[in-house]
Regions:
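Active-site helical microenvironments for divalent-metal-assisted chemistry
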Residues: 1-141
């Protein structure tokens, strides 16, 4: 299933670029490397497909991804009009989402991938730091 997730993510993110101008698929692949279980790795690779691509939950179901994986991907999808910390609190209710979001934040907080960080990048880093503290609390139980 992990190989299927990688192929699906590569296809879905094709042509997308990150804030540093690099192919976007590198981000979910790096997040995956910070995860331990196969389930975490699958969610990591797919964590932005619902929010940032045309992939639907129905397609993921047809591809054979479990209900738990699909529910976790829904949990990791930032809803329109939802405050960022509200989104983080929602993630804190799902242990699998918590573990993947922690890895996601670690990668998002690495400003070395952005050639010339701006004030906006540093403000985003501060927001991510607050989220990371809350996610770490959730990880401790």
């Amino acid at each position: 299933m992990l190989e299927r997730a990688k192929r699906l993510a590569e296809h879905a993110h094709q042509g997308q670029r990150d804030k540093g101008g690099h192919p976007y698929i590198l981000h979910p692949m790096r997040v995956m490397q910070h995860c331990e279980t196969e389930e975490e790795k699958i969610v990591a690779v797919l964590h932005d497909v619902i929010e940032d691509t045309e992939v639907t939950l129905e397609e993921l179901k047809k591809e054979g991804f479990s209900e738990e994986i699909r529910n976790t991907l829904v949990c990791l999808t930032h809803r329109e009009g939802e405050g960022y910390m509200e989104y983080i609190e929602r993630i804190c209710q799902n242990p699998l989402a918590v573990r993947v979001k922690y890895a996601d934040l670690q990668d998002n907080m690495d400003l070395s991938r952005i050639p010339n960080p701006t004030e906006k990048d540093y403000a985003r880093l501060e927001k991510y730091q607050k989220a990371k503290v809350r996610i770490e609390e959730a990880m401790k139980g």
